[in-house]
């Protein structure tokens, strides 16, 4: 049997502001942005450049209980992990683009890591795993 996770839904306040952040600040690719009239919503998918795996489905909150989770989808823990082939290139570019890092870079046994916030406050790891770490 072969299975894989294709999308992770990320609850957002507004499609366009989320697209702006992920595409213009994090340099993700906009894979799809399709309006679904029957449900009055958009199917918006973004993915890191060069990714061949999981993508983010940007899902606009449509109910009060969904709004409560914007920016806190992991209960204050790191929610998503962005692996890179060049930590310092991406860290420096992200700082120049105004990304807020809440924990500075650290060398760990598994590689180099720093924690940043997305536009809503969800925590992400930017990391470069060392050669001994499987993905």
Curated annotation (Swiss-Prot):
Domain VOC: 4-129
Pfam families, per the entry: Glyoxalase
The organism's place on the tree of life at top rank: Bacteria
Gene3D superfamilies the record matches: 2,3-Dihydroxybiphenyl 1,2-Dioxygenase, domain 1 (3.10.180.10)
InterPro entries: Glyas_Bleomycin-R_OHBP_Dase (IPR029068), Glyas_Fos-R_dOase_dom (IPR004360), VOC (IPR037523)
PROSITE patterns reported for this sequence: VOC
Family from the record: To B.subtilis YwkD.
UniProt name for this protein: Uncharacterized protein Sfri_3691
The species this protein was found in: Shewanella frigidimarina (strain NCIMB 400)
């Amino acid at each position: 049997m072969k299975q894989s996770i294709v999308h992770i839904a990320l609850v957002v306040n507004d499609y366009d502001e989320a697209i702006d952040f992920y595409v213009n600040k994090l340099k993700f690719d906009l894979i799809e942005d399709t309006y679904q009239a029957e449900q009055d919503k958009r199917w918006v998918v973004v993915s890191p450049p060069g990714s061949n795996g999981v993508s983010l489905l940007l899902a606009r909150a449509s109910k009060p209980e969904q709004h409560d989770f914007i920016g806190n989808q992991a209960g204050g823990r790191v929610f998503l992990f962005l692996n890179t082939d060049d930590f310092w290139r991406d860290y420096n570019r992200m700082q120049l683009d105004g990304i807020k890092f809440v924990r500075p870079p650290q060398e760990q046994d598994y590689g180099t890591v720093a924690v940043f916030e997305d536009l809503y406050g969800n925590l992400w790891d930017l990391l470069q795993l060392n050669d001994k770490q499987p993905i």
